[in-house]
Amino acid sequence: MTIQTKRKWILLLAVLLLAAALSVGSTSLWKAEKEKRGEGYVAVVRIDGAIYGGPETDSMLSGSSGSSSEEIMRELQEARKDPQAKAILIRINSPDGSTGATQEIAEEMDKIRSSKKPIVISMGDMCASAGYWLASKGNYIFASPATMTGSIGVYMDYTNIEDLMDKVGVKNDKIKSGAHKDILSMYRPMTGEEREMLQSMVDDIYHQFVQTVADGRHMDEEKVKSIADGRILTGRQAQDLGLVDAMGNYYDALNYAASSGGLDVDHIETRSYTNSAVTLRSLLRGEAVRL
């Protein structure tokens, strides 16, 4: 290789290095300008129907819908870890749900709150019981005046068909390892001791519910208890009681979320993290204490 050829290669290498440096510099400036303009998006997570534990499942027999705790948790995790998701808008249209599934989702919402990303709640037609448990975890809650919400309380039900079994001449018998192994059996009456045990469970979960609302809404626990008798409230009534922050629809909540996340409210982009697969709620789920 001649000296002239070497000089050409050195010059070419210098040009390439300079171009790379300029590219890195311009990229950094572009990113800085992007952050300065507040670019990014609002992550939107939807909770529709009753909240249940486990994964989304397909069932040709099921015409009902609901929200899987595992799916909602996955979406919330992605929104929390996504650096471009500057705020999270959770649209809730749910009448109730299982306690464990609701608490799982609530824990993911706590992690988002700890990351300092704002969570804005938009209530749909109904955001009651388990739906309100989750709503109370948000930084700010929007509802429509006629939204059905509240229903702060816990219940556990069971059916006893002992008399019916006697009428049709069918007898149920079982072998069990302990006196209470078949508690909630529909084939025998509940004992007084069992009723006390179950009432204790319901009372414990009720206290957890009340404490969650009191903490989330910065309310005195006794004040929450005074309205935590299962009553249904309109959105306007809930606002008067301190359970809702403002009247507004989905887009009002979206604008507030964008503003809270430092985004341009005139050019809001949204992103959802839902699976593309169409799933239906399984009919066959175990018994659970419900909110």
Residue ranges and their predicted role:
Residues W133-N139:
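Alpha-helix C-terminal capping segments
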Residues M126-S129, M148-I152:
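Short gly/pro/ser/thr-enriched loop/turn and capping motifs at secondary-structure boundaries
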Residues A101, G131-Y132, G153:
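Short glycine-/acidic-enriched loop or helix-start segments at secondary-structure transitions
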